Regions:
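C-terminal motif of bacterial Sec signal peptides marking the signal peptidase cleavage site
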Residues: 21-23
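Conserved hydrolase catalytic core segment
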Residues: 140-178
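Conserved HGGG/HGGXW glycine-rich cap/lid loop of the alpha/beta-hydrolase fold
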Residues: 61-113
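Active-site loop/oxyanion-hole signature of alpha/beta-hydrolase fold enzymes
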Residues: 105-146
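Bacterial N-terminal signal peptides that target proteins for export
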Residues: 2-13
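Post-His helix in hydrolase/transferase enzymes
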Residues: 269-281
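Conserved serine/cysteine hydrolase catalytic core
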Residues: 182, 192-263, 268-269
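Short, low-complexity, disordered segments immediately C-terminal to signal peptides
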Residues: 25-53
């Protein structure tokens, strides 16, 4: 589900560096306070790590450094994508529950520890960045894709662009391609301007059409959608329209599953247990 980007998560994890340390240690605390500063804040790595090694660095993609943190292991790698207004550190609590599973988190361009660039870019650009990032870091497919909010819609786009690389998808209250069609016609220009005034510089509203064009290419893998049923939906949407469209979306997938949670939109911070359970089930093929 979309939220206005400048609201973001609101209780963002203070340091992205905790992501790798939490996953490696299997540690339990959800509190990121006191985390040590990552060495990637001082230097940018240009040499790809060897296969099977842990990663915690900036990887050069198209001339700029993108932050990537991965833990090795057997089986498909679980790749996490944050929402607009979030960062890779938002997944720390979830990763601490998945220390035995290979995982990767990253910051998109203009986010967190990743480099900044001027101008605007598309969601398709983000997908190509992620594909190049994983290749440069020698993180081989298959992947289980996990995304929150806008990051979830981008993971659907990744699956539609590279279907042979994907074994499963977990969507944590993800923005979905049909949402712009729920907006009243006379408000769409204003909503577009509001959504596109985001700190990432991504064409948020244009991503809806990009994602819709790829829906038919999403592979028939398990897709779990975790819905924060207590969130406040945009007031301009007709009552019940979102829920009906969400059910149609899930029912239209070859292997779709909807899980309703007594939570709002901020599932990575409020429902890490539910996300971790869904990821583990998908990882194990249950």
């Amino acid at each position: 589900m979309r939220h206005i980007p400048d609201q973001g998560i609101g209780r963002m994890v203070a340091s992205t560096a905790i992501v790798l340390s939490a996953a490696c240690s299997g540690g339990g605390s959800d509190d990121a306070s006191g985390a040590s500063e990552s060495p990637t804040q001082q230097a940018s790595a240009s040499v790809a790590p060897s296969a099977g090694a842990a990663v915690d660095e900036l990887v050069q993609v198209k001339g700029r450094g993108l932050y990537l943190a991965c833990t090795p292991g057997d089986g498909p790698t679980v790749v996490f994508s944050h929402g607009v207004g979030g960062q890779s550190g938002d997944w720390a609590a979830t990763l601490s529950r998945l220390a035995d599973i290979p995982t990767c988190v990253y910051d998109r361009v203009n986010v967190g520890l990743s480099d900044k660039e001027a101008g605007r870019h598309s969601a398709t650009d983000d997908i190509e960045d992620l594909h190049a990032l994983l290749a440069a870091a020698e993180i081989e497919p298959p992947y289980v894709l996990v995304g929150h909010s806008f990051g979830g819609m981008e993971m659907l786009m990744y699956a539609g662009t590279y279907p042979e690389d994907v074994e499963g998808i977990v969507l944590a209250d993800a923005t979905l391609p049909f949402e712009s069609q729920l907006d009243p016609l006379d408000q769409r220009a204003e909503i577009r301007a509001e959504l596109n005034a985001n700190p990432e510089g991504v064409d948020f509203y244009g991503a809806y059409a990009e994602a819709r064009a790829l829906l038919g290419s999403i592979p028939g893998v398990p897709v779990t959608y975790l819905f924060g049923a207590q969130q406040v939906l945009p007031p301009e949407w007709e009552e019940g329209a979102y829920e009906a469209a969400l059910h149609r979306f899930i029912d239209g997938l070859p292997d779709g599953r909807l899980v309703e949670l007594a939570a709002d939109h901020d599932l990575p911070l409020d429902e890490p247990d539910a996300i971790a359970e869904a990821v583990r089930r998908t990882f194990l093929g249950e």
